[in-house]
């Protein structure tokens, strides 16, 4: 029920009401005995002189003990008493005195409205309304003040709704609103350079309004709100979402009961400690965590867990009293006032709003004083005590006087901006189970003051507003690059030495017979492959982005051309060995080095076509691949996001598929040729065996290197190491296989090339006479001109043999037709022929001789007469030309003639020799007859 004013009249009974003056003494004594302290001025305040007219002020606040917020009203009454007493002592309103009439609203809308209307109807004409604690009651009354031309001043209503001046134009408050903390929070965020925050709000209108206003303030200052979460009962889901969005600075708006749940959830999610900062309301009850930890325990959150999660949170609230040692409008410092207040309340619980109530009384007094001055200066001669609820002019004068308020009170500088108090906001921090003031924000001056060495963070520095992502380029290790570069340089020096060796000894038979031009191509390809290693190791840590993009193309071209040059040369040499020795019908075919160069050139042409199309249609570009974040190895509060540079394009898979398909087919065919010629052995003359081994080496290592480098594309050091080692290994092994045997042979036995020119080739397919070795000719492919000369000479000798066969046949027929001369021919003629044509050293029984005999018989079928012919069946051995004696005689004539006819072309008897009977060794032009040439003759 409403508390009757000290000099007013109680609620009248049904008409006719009794005069108020008859009940006044009784009501005063009754109310003072039942509710001591309900009126601050009634307890020890000096009585105004009887002739002083009162200036009535309506006081609306909860006073009863049954209401929780009644303690606020009872707690501020001692401060109100002090203010009224000091105002009267200073005669600030002389000849008037301030008359505050209190009405209990009980924090109930109906009872508050009834008390307001009773004061309007039955009380005196109140100049102003002082009070308003409960938001719902205050908002209802404040909305109707304009109709009564009354200005209301609240000392405890902090709800942001009342800041709407369109709806509440006559409402003021000395206490900052809940929204007043938002500029202070903004200043704190800027001070610690926190540019990214998240909000966690309880689904209550009061908190939602603060959150909405804070959102506008932060957006205006370009501070990112990365996540906005709200909850009704269970905050754990919202807390988990905040963590998932990497929110480090959390701005909370919830009551103290929900605060315990929030911090328990934060403990479960590990959202506390040096990486996180919680900023929550600071108006909770003292030691609020002690009151709610029992409920927290019921949710499986122990007290120590709650305190651990709370450690370091920052509370934001208005400052109850100014901390400055400055005299206020009353002539006393805030500290002196506080001591007087504590001594005066005498058992009444303190209220944190008492300073705002004290300053509020002074605001009312200064407003009325200014209004009286305005009336006195006007020509209307109106008195302030003549105010009534329909006096719009005086109401506007009081409203304007309120807006002009500016003085220093116990709560700081008292200034209104659009009816809102520009007060002081304090910051407290929870440290070691207690709240410590660490700073304050002055809204008038817009300054933030952090008390030295009071604010503490659990880390060495304030938490970061987000996980600091350090984008780190994964680069090639400099020591690794240096080591592999050194190996590459050694390989290039070795290749240069081989090139020098190959060029210097190009006229040596050993080098000539292994195609020195093709060997030069192998060296060139190896050196290009070596050079590509330097380019593959250059990344963003060594070169610029533009240069890296250029290197993408250059290194691809160099490696491709180098591979094709080296492998193509080996492939061509392997193909020539296969073409010569796999098909005996091709033994008369000449495969020159020029043809091999054409093969290599064709391969390079295909490469160039692919590379040019690739570059023109879809060139390689520098791309940066970002990987998932990794913790800092040094333990810092940062996360590392690895970056890796790649050379890619839009259709990378297609182009690589084309290149791999072409190279793969070439490699498979090369391995096939190497396998087919695996049993070809050409000691000291040919390097086909080593070329085949090189083909195997390159094929296997390229497959392994391509696969492993693809799997390790996210590890540049491993990938570069594998690619470089594969290139070094393939190039080095290939060059060593091709040149080291030649180098050793040339150093140890320079004549090895001319000592053994025979080789055996075993066919894979079984023939009727399996395990039979066929002697074939080793053709010096490097000496094309010499080979052509030998072929011409061979043709000439064959024609000469044909003529000799005809002559011999005629002689034989003559012998058969003249038997009477047989004895003479047998005894004299054959002896003469033997003396003339026989050679003393032509009796060696070698395989080459047998081959000559066999081939000669095969190529002269006319010598094999039909022994069954009737005319040739004479029993006389002399008359039978097919008898062994005749055959022996014929061979004794043919072979010496054949031998001497061929000798000049192969370095035998000089054509100018006087007699063929002279030994070939006697000729100054005599040379050792190579076995290969003897075999060649046998195939005529």
From Swiss-Prot:
At the top level of its lineage, which domain of life is listed? Eukaryota
- Which residue intervals are topologically Cytoplasmic? 504-521, 572-596, 675-690, 741-940
Could you tell me the keywords of this UniProt record?
A: Cell membrane, Coiled coil, Disulfide bond, G-protein coupled receptor, Glycoprotein, Membrane, Phosphoprotein, Postsynaptic cell membrane, Receptor, Signal, Synapse, Transducer, Transmembrane, Transmembrane helix
* Bilayer-spanning residue ranges: 483-503, 522-542, 551-571, 597-617, 654-674, 691-711, 720-740
Which membrane topology describes this protein? Multi-pass membrane protein
Which Cys residues form disulphide pairs? 107-134, 236-265, 264-301
Q: Name one GO cellular component term.
A: cytoplasm
Q: Name one GO molecular function term.
A: G protein-coupled GABA receptor activity
Residues with Phosphothreonine modification? 818
- Compartments, record wording: Cell membrane; Postsynaptic cell membrane
Extracellular membrane side: 41-482, 543-550, 618-653, 712-719
Keyword Transmembrane helix attributed: yes
Q: Which residues carry this modification: Phosphoserine?
A: 775, 778, 883, 892, 912, 915, 919, 923
The Swiss-Prot or TrEMBL note on domains reads:
Alpha-helical parts of the C-terminal intracellular region mediate heterodimeric interaction with GABBR1.
PANTHER family annotated for this entry? GABA-B RECEPTOR (PTHR10519), GAMMA-AMINOBUTYRIC ACID TYPE B RECEPTOR SUBUNIT 2 (PTHR10519:SF74)
How is this protein organized at the quaternary level?
Answer: Heterodimer of GABBR1 and GABBR2. Homodimers may form, but are inactive. Interacts (via C-terminus) with ATF4 (via leucine zipper domain).
- Annotated protein name in UniProt: Gamma-aminobutyric acid type B receptor subunit 2
Its source organism is Mus musculus (Mouse)
Please name the gene that encodes this protein. Answer: Gabbr2
